[in-house]
Amino acid sequence: MTGKKRSASSSRWLQEHFSDKYVQQAQKKGLRSRAWFKLDEIQQSDKLFKPGMTVVDLGAAPGGWSQYVVTQIGGKGRIIACDLLPMDPIVGVDFLQGDFRDELVMKALLERVGDSKVQVVMSDMAPNMSGTPAVDIPRAMYLVELALEMCRDVLAPGGSFVVKVFQGEGFDEYLREIRSLFTKVKVRKPDSSRARSREVYIVATGRK
């Protein structure tokens, strides 16, 4: 892509971003990101979070999802969050900065969870996008497979999993894998998710 084309594309993205009603609402409310609204929509339909729960947040930065969940689980709840990027502190959130794909980071995350099981694992992870689906989709699928492995390790029976997935090669197989592990599985496309985006959210409840 030439610099001129890239500049035009970036300008269009910025224009779309700042005219987005959810971006504007997030700024007015002092929220960390528009992702807050996506999780709010999912919570309204699926009732994943309750006071006192322990929740794992993968791909947490800048903190929109953790910021939302804190309001749902209260002071007795706990969030263990992880991201490659830094994240400003949130009261009630135990944040680990590191690459989730790294075995040592995964080990450190499991140590923070401890022996007790968690009630919800949520993943908003995504790779750095190149714009080429043949490259981006496999990278994204690798991350969501790791998130599902995390569920196998730490999620309590009856627990829930919400994960951002990009539709493309491997999506149907991944959905089948989740259906084998949970009693109820829904695919959600929140209104606050941009229409042109390939992203959807798989909401799985009732860990078998």
Curated annotation (Swiss-Prot):
Residues at the catalytic site: K164
Name of the protein: Ribosomal RNA large subunit methyltransferase E
E.C. code: 2.1.1.166
Keywords: Cytoplasm, Methyltransferase, rRNA processing, S-adenosyl-L-methionine, Transferase
Secretion signal span: none
Membership in a protein family: Belongs to the class I-like SAM-binding methyltransferase superfamily. RNA methyltransferase RlmE family.
InterPro entries xref list: RNA_methyltr_RlmE (IPR050082), RNA_MeTrfase_FtsJ_dom (IPR002877), rRNA-MeTfrase_E (IPR015507), rRNA_MeTrfase_gammaproteobac (IPR004512), SAM-dependent_MTases_sf (IPR029063)
SUPFAM superfamilies per the UniProt record, alphabetical: S-adenosyl-L-methionine-dependent methyltransferases
Catalyzed reaction equations: uridine(2552) in 23S rRNA + S-adenosyl-L-methionine = 2'-O-methyluridine(2552) in 23S rRNA + S-adenosyl-L-homocysteine + H(+)
A Pfam family this chain is assigned to: FtsJ
Main location, first listed in the record: cytoplasm
Gene Ontology molecular-function annotations: rRNA (uridine-2'-O-)-methyltransferase activity
Subcellular location: Cytoplasm
Biological role stated in the UniProt entry: Specifically methylates the uridine in position 2552 of 23S rRNA at the 2'-O position of the ribose in the fully assembled 50S ribosomal subunit.
